[in-house]
Swiss-Prot record:
This is tRNA uridine 5-carboxymethylaminomethyl modification enzyme MnmG. It comes from the Bacteria. Signal peptide: none annotated. Homodimer. Heterotetramer of two MnmE and two MnmG subunits. NAD(+) binds at residues 274-288. Its main location: cytoplasm. GO terms for biological process: tRNA methylation; tRNA wobble uridine modification. It is found in: Cytoplasm. Pfam families: GIDA, GIDA_C_1st, SAM_GIDA_C. GO terms for molecular function: flavin adenine dinucleotide binding. It comes from Bordetella parapertussis (strain 12822 / ATCC BAA-587 / NCTC 13253). One of its GO terms (cellular component) is cytosol. FAD binds at residues 13-18. PROSITE patterns: GIDA_1, GIDA_2.
Length: 639
């Protein structure tokens, strides 16, 4: 039967991409339906119980700045918070959180159930309704037809999912869940370009059987305690727990090598390529044969369970080999395994067949987000989900889409990399992928994106008010530092030497003094004149987050200004559109190879064309000349 109500947006799948897509579409004002095979697993953390990390934390902050739920749910569920690279520059500092799986899932479900314009329905989707080249809805496994103007597909690892433990395998979307084989077959019929990838997970351990006395404890950060969301507070956090560290050894490596003949990866059973930056333990032993030991992080899965996630020993080896390798690790000699590790192989679709909005080029109104696009990680999925959900809603409402630029957001880097370069292995975000990472910091994600989110309808009044207060306070303080001047009479030699290491010889603004590498905002604000008055005067920021933002903006102002100059130079051609119907064969000045690559990738802009592998700067110059001729010819005809 046809469901009696029509929707603007249908989201298929309730993982990290699907939940953010549904929430974003609903926040943008679209009547949204989230279809999931199991409402109980909405927001499920299928693999590791952590969120964030280098590059990944930046994406979570951006999702949060755009009104998304991942960061605030993590603040409510996080049982250990750390800032990675805390001793390095602000561009590469990143938040990483251990999360209680149940608390996180509950936090996400509460937001989904209380989001206006959003309906949930429990049914697996077996088919898409397509008329011509336009998607018009989805069909569930009981034949129920839901109609919508747009559909966002976030199928994760469920499309023709195949789980491997040793040489045995069975169909599944993840352990305990069925695969989406019918939907996978339907997508093949639509002739969208696809491939196979794989990912894996380690065996889980009963913490009561671990000897913690021989392990290294890894506590979270306590002073200050980090928060993930710009609206987060440390008081939201539940009870905190430590992680523990052990190491593999020669015996572990010997056990693994002895089992490689029964490994599905090394016996050719698995065809899909695994993630380079999250390799299985057998892959580590094979690729880094000269390394005597590898770290294994024992991460708690939650406050009300003894289950431990041994991060670093993801494996698809037979269970008897898993059993031996776990018991070879110090502290785990008597460990009880609760669940076996496994690898899962699944279909993904070449993201070069997507527009930068994450809409498929072949089927209007159909958007893809998450692992279906060849990415790995909760954070990458959530970011894509938010963008796809927002753009699906905008399209359903007849509005212009939003495409973040590479200089605007890590989300822009992620999407641009996917749609121009494609993937040959699961894609993971790193800060090194961003050319403009000094401007794309965790701490300024809201200053970069919240105004855009407000314009798109993604940011509510509470977030907007908090952001506006922060933005204005930071701007006022930066301006105050620029306009407040001190001279040798006001800052005598002994005070200057204490603050700066030497006396000042002329007049300086407070901003000039703060730019010096050994001067902090806090020290500058505490400096006093001979009369005992505060050098900085009234108006000092007491909020540490705001003070850090001011210090970063002032200290890096010169570098950021130079980077912005670079951005402006690139933007003139970066955003120049290429006609969708361009005939590359008519651009005879281009080599045959370049013409073939451009015909295959069909880039939407000059910037995208420049990032296609094998397309040289000289070829871009020739393409620009051709586009100018086309433009001149069309103007001449119009006249």
């Amino acid at each position: 039967m046809d469901f009696p109500r029509e929707f603007d947006v249908i989201v298929v799948g309730g993982g990290h991409a699907g939940t953010e897509a549904a929430l974003a579409a609903a926040r943008a004002g679209a009547q949204t339906l989230l279809l999931t095979h199991n409402i109980e697993t909405l927001g499920q953390m299928s693999c590791n119980p952590s969120i964030g990390g280098i590059g990944k934390g930046h994406l979570v902050k951006e999702v949060d700045a755009l009104g998304g739920a991942m960061a605030i749910a993590t603040d409510e569920a996080g049982i250990q918070f750390r800032i990675l690279n805390s001793s390095k520059g602000p561009a590469v500092r990143a938040t990483r959180v251990q999360a209680d799986r149940v608390l996180y899932r509950n936090a996400m479900r509460a937001r989904l159930e209380n989001q206006p314009n959003l309906w949930l329905f429990q049914q697996a989707v077996d088919d898409l309704m397509v008329q011509g080249d336009q998607v018009v809805g989805a069909v569930t496994q009981i034949g129920l037809r839901f109609r919508a103007r747009t559909v966002v597909l976030t199928a994760g690892t469920f499309l023709n999912g195949l789980i491997h433990v040793g040489l045995q395998n069975y169909s599944g979307g993840r352990a305990g869940d069925p695969p989406a084989n019918s939907l996978g077959q339907r997508l093949k019929e639509l002739q969208l370009p696809q491939g196979r990838l794989k990912t894996g997970t380690p065996p889980r351990i009963d913490g009561r059987s671990i000897n913690y006395s021989v392990l290294e404890e890894q506590p979270g950060d306590l002073d200050p305690v980090p928060v993930f969301s710009f609206l987060g507070k440390a008081s939201m956090h539940p009870r905190q727990l430590p992680c523990w560290i052990t190491h593999t050894n020669a015996r572990t490596h010997e056990i693994i090598r002895g089992g490689l003949d029964r490994s599905p990866m090394y016996s050719g059973v698995i065809e899909g390529v695994g993630p380079r930056y999250c390799p299985s333990i057998e892959d580590k032993i094979h690729r880094f044969a000269d390394k005597a030991s590898h770290q294994v992080f024992l991460e708690p899965e939650g406050l009300n369970t003894h289950e431990i996630y041994p991060n670093g020993v993801s494996t698809s080896l037979p269970f008897d080999v898993q059993y031996e390798l776990i018991h070879s690790l110090p502290g785990l000699e008597n460990a009880h395994i609760l669940r076996p590790g496994y690898a899962i192989e699944y279909d993904y679709f070449d993201p070069r067949a997507l527009k930068s909005t994450l809409e498929t080029k072949a089927i209007s109104g159909l958007f893809f987000a998450g692992q279906i696009n060849g990415t790995t990680g909760y954070e990458e999925a959530a970011a894509q989900g938010l963008l796809a959900g927002a753009n699906a809603a905008l399209q359903a409402q007849g509005k212009e889409p939003w495409v973040p630029r590479r200089d605007e957001a890590y989300l822009g880097v992620l999407v641009d990399d996917l749609v121009t370069r494609g993937v040959t292995e699961p894609y993971r975000m790193f800060t090194s992928r961003a050319e403009y990472r000094l401007s794309l910091r965790e701490d300024n994600a809201d200053l970069r994106l919240t105004e855009i989110g407000r314009r798109l309808g993604l940011v509510d009044d509470v977030r907007w008010d908090a952001f506006s207060r922060k933005r204005d306070a930071v701007a006022q303080e930066v301006e105050r530092l620029k306009s407040t001047w001190v001279n040798p009479r006001v800052l005598p030699a002994h005070a200057a030497e204490a603050l700066l290491g030497k006396a000042i010889e002329r007049e300086y603004s407070l901003s000039d003094l703060l730019k010096r590498p050994n001067v902090s905002y806090e020290a500058l604000m505490q400096a006093r004149t001979d009369e005992g008055e505060l050098l900085a005067g009234p108006g000092v920021l007491e909020d540490d987050v705001l003070a850090e933002q001011v210090e970063t903006q002032v200290k890096y102002a010169g570098y950021i200004a130079r980077q912005q100059d670079e951005v402006q130079k690139h933007l003139s051609h970066e955003q120049q559109p290429i006609p969708a119907d361009i005939d590359y064969d008519a651009v005879t000045s281009l080599s045959f190879e370049v013409r073939q690559k451009l015909k295959t990738h069909r880039p939407e802009t000059i910037g995208q064309a420049a990032r296609v592998s094998g397309v040289t700067p000289a070829a871009i110059s020739l393409l620009l000349i051709h586009l100018k001729r086309l433009h001149y010819g069309s103007r001449k005809q119009a006249a």
